[in-house]
Amino acid sequence: MAARNTARKRAFQILFEGDQRGADVLTVLADWVRHSRSDTRQPPVSEYTMELVEGYAGRAERIDELIAQYSVDWTLDRMPVVDRNILRLGAYELLWVDATPDAVVLDEMVQLAKEFSTDESPAFINGLLGRLKELKPSLRRE
């Protein structure tokens, strides 16, 4: 499943870039797709990356509400940008992508935190996404 792992990493990078630039993630996604088509050195943006980014974008407000509600002692603005965007991606895939097992989502997001964030972040990511997983049936409302 290396392709899915890469797709998640690229989706995270797109969400991160959008957050850093204050740009809409769909605009950033379109930029990535356009760039990958015009520069043969860039790998194409996979369908799954597009699905993740577009899915998050369609539920961004609800996802941010959930993260804010269940992150103890952290507001979205105070969270490290990396953690905030790993949580956004993880919350979307956990709650709305039924084809991916919950344990896989948690593991993949923890791995992203290990690669891109602080030493404390993997436990924070795992704890918050684990809580969302427990409450999943009641959280899927639109």
UniProtKB/Swiss-Prot annotation:
Involved in transcription antitermination. Required for transcription of ribosomal RNA (rRNA) genes. Binds specifically to the boxA antiterminator sequence of the ribosomal RNA (rrn) operons. GO terms for cellular component: cytosol. Belongs to the NusB family. This is Transcription antitermination protein NusB. InterPro entries: NusB-like_sf (IPR035926), NusB_fam (IPR011605), NusB_RsmB_TIM44 (IPR006027). Keywords: RNA-binding, Transcription, Transcription antitermination, Transcription regulation. It comes from Streptomyces coelicolor (strain ATCC BAA-471 / A3(2) / M145). GO terms for biological process: DNA-templated transcription termination; transcription antitermination. One of its GO terms (molecular function) is RNA binding. Pfam families: NusB.
